[in-house]
Regions:
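Short, membrane-interfacial amphipathic segments enriched in basic
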Residues: 1-16, 216-227
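Helix-loop boundary and gating motifs at the non-cytosolic
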Residues: 5-66, 235-285
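Helix-boundary and loop/linker segments of multi-pass membrane transporters
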Residues: 13-19, 106-110, 187, 233-239, ...
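Substrate-agnostic recognition of the 12-TM MFS/MFS-like secondary transporter fold
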Residues: 22-40, 61-79, 83-98, 115-174, ...
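Hydrophobic/aromatic positions within or immediately flanking transmembrane alpha-helices
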Residues: 25, 41, 58-61, 88-89, ...
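Transmembrane alpha-helix termini and helix-breaking/packing motifs in multi-pass membrane transporters
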Residues: 44-50, 103-108, 164-195, 269-270, ...
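C-terminal transmembrane bundle of multi-pass solute transporters/carriers
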Residues: 69-74, 81, 85-97, 101, ...
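Helix-loop junctions on the cytosolic side of multi-pass membrane transporters
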Residues: 109, 136, 140, 189-191, ...
Length: 435
């Protein structure tokens, strides 16, 4: 038993053997706790400012993810031309600035829905470059054999931090009542404390990014940015494994992967939850996602679980639609998180291991485009369908979103890859230790 447990541990966390990746992973974990605490506080703030409007939540989500829809392809060409360290430090400084602005305006009581939307748009612009750059840098610090594990551990970090950050939101907001709101639980300034803590969390990852020894990489010859974008698009169109995985991720992101709208609306409006229960329900989703990432971290062939993750995600979303209250919603949301992360880690690893390195920035930006860029239309679709003022209401609106996702899965079922075909002459970059 102990030998099996030890083998599982070594297999599941193999990428953390590499010290540079380990430093980055730990700093990112700390920073993301602050980011998730801010994201949860921002959702709650929007609902408070708008009187519980699902449409307002949808509009802010559109503002946050619209830049990925508009800029992802351009961002990929930039990432393949510019050193990744420079891109990442720049994006982190922009995100630090927007977090500071949100903290100060909320504390002073001058925050407005329009200001939140503007800051969400600026943050989204930074994330349009940050997300594909972070995904691309996985191959800089781990050998090829550990790439699937590193992708899974990145998702684990994302969801451990989601669980901690969302659970801390209720506690920190309660502290904010006494520290920032003069004991008044209805003053919006209580919500500034999560934003201030997020500001502090950026400094760890900035220090690590400034001191990590990024390996040299071949930038190569480039034409115009438009030519580079077209080259990436041609590659995806000509590579069925990558094309079909991206189609599935994009279609599910448009329909059912809209939990940044679904969870806060169900928690605050449908179930009537206050800060503590709101944070608990959000954290339950993160616990399930964390379990999905851990499960995927020990799998040598990530392509096998694309279908499994999608089925679990869709079935649990339907179950959430018929859940009567927050107590039963927590395990259902955990199942949603497990299914979503099983799908997304499988998809990301499959794409990362299939593409050549000279196209990595462009292809991963296209992946970000279909995952995050579908957020704006998906958020509008979700907020329209699940809103109490909408044509279907929360229950049948969510069932409809799940059914649309199910149609997409059935259409692509036979075309999804079952194993990974690596690019020709795949090799580890200079400076990365071999397995």
């Amino acid at each position: 038993v102990f030998a099996r447990a030890s083998a599982w541990r070594a297999r599941t966390f193999s990428a953390l053997r590499h010290p540079h990746y380990r430093r980055y992973w730990l700093s990112q974990l700390l920073s993301l706790v602050g980011s998730w605490m801010q994201a949860t506080a921002q959702q709650y703030l929007v609902l408070e400012l708008s009187g519980g409007s699902s449409a307002a939540l949808g509009y802010v989500t559109v503002a946050q993810f619209l830049p990925s829809l508009l800029l992802s392809l351009f961002a990929g060409a930039v990432i393949d031309r510019v050193p990744r360290r420079r891109v990442l430090i720049t994006t982190q400084l922009v995100l630090l600035s927007t977090a500071t602005a949100l903290a100060v305006t909320t504390h002073l009581g001058v925050v407005s829905l329009g200001l939140v939307m503007v800051l969400a748009f600026v943050s989204g612009t930074a994330n349009a470059f940050d997300m594909p750059a972070r995904q691309s840098m996985v191959v800089d610090f781990v050998p090829r054999g550990d790439v699937p594990n590193a992708v899974a551990l990145n998702s684990l970090s994302f969801n451990v931090s989601r669980t901690i950050g969302q659970a801390l939101f209720g506690v920190v907001a309660a502290l904010g009542v006494s520290l920032l709101a003069g004991g008044d639980p209805d003053r919006l300034s209580r919500l500034a404390l999560p934003f201030y803590l997020n500001v502090g969390s950026f400094f760890a990852v900035l220090f690590v990014l400034a001191t990590l020894p990024f390996p040299p990489r071949e930038i190569g010859q480039h034409g115009s940015v438009a030519d580079d974008v077209r080259e990436g698009l041609r590659y995806v169109r000509a590579t069925p494994a990558v094309r079909n995985v991206m189609l599935l991720v994009g279609l599910l992101s448009l329909t059912v992967i809209n939990f940044n709208v679904i969870i806060p609306y169900y928690a605050r409006v449908v179930f009537g939850a206050r800060e503590a229960a709101f944070g608990t329900l959000s954290a339950a989703f993160g616990v399930g996602a964390m379990a999905g990432a851990l499960w995927q971290a020990s799998k040598p062939n990530p392509a096998r679980n694309l279908r499994v993750g999608a089925v679990i995600l869709l079935a649990s979303a339907v179950a959430l639609a018929f859940t009567p209250g927050p107590a039963l919603a927590a395990p259902v949301l955990a199942a949603c998180g497990f299914g979503m992360l099983t799908l997304l880690v499988s998809a990301n690893s499959t794409v990362q291991l299939t593409i050549p390195d000279h196209l990595r920035g462009r292809v991963m930006s296209l992946y970000s485009f279909v995952l995050v860029g579908m957020g704006p239309p998906g958020a509008l679709l979700a907020s329209t369908l699940i809103g109490r003022e909408g044509p279907l209401g929360p229950r049948w609106g969510l069932v409809t979103l799940s059914a649309l996702g199910g149609v997409a899965l059935l259409a692509l079922w036979g075309r999804l890859p079952r194993r990974i075909t690596p690019p020709a002459a795949a090799a580890d970059p200079p400076g990365v230790p071999a397995d």
